[in-house]
Amino acid sequence: MLKSVRLYIPSIAVMILSSNIAIANKNYDAGNATPLRQVADLIDNQITNIDNLFKNRLSLYESNSIKSNFITKDKQYIIVMEVPGFDKSQIKVKVNGNKLFITGNIEEKNKADYSDNYMNKNFNYVISLYEDVDQANISSSLKNGILTIILPRIEIKEQEAREIVID
């Protein structure tokens, strides 16, 4: 008996929803809206609000993300990064082994009348260097919010294969 009731209730709901034109039609007069339509609209509005919340969050992330470009030339590699709002004291470029570390950090605390405002903006990149990068002569510059890192290339001499004698 319980199984037949479980199947019967959803069947009734489907029949009501499919037969009621006011529910199926979004172009209805709000004064003549059925309670079920009002509930459906409330759910639609909540889902739309959730979608908009994530949409705005993603667009905020995209607008604040660091844009970069890696250019390969015959005698050098060039890394160009857009870092608006950063000055050179807030950016560090370091080499350790075959890794290039690029970090930026801005922390500001502004005291307003009755509240504290904090701004924290940072980025962190780790780039594996090719073996033909002359690590001793890497240079960087910052101009108008554009960080440019020059990675000079050196010629790598291929070692000739030598045969190892087996004892």
UniProtKB/Swiss-Prot annotation:
Domain of life: Bacteria
Gene Ontology MF term list: unfolded protein binding
Key words, A-Z: Stress response
Lyase found in the keyword field: no
GO cellular component: cytoplasm
Family: Belongs to the small heat shock protein (HSP20) family.
Protein name, UniProt field: Small heat shock protein C1
Organism in which the protein naturally occurs: Rickettsia conorii (strain ATCC VR-613 / Malish 7)
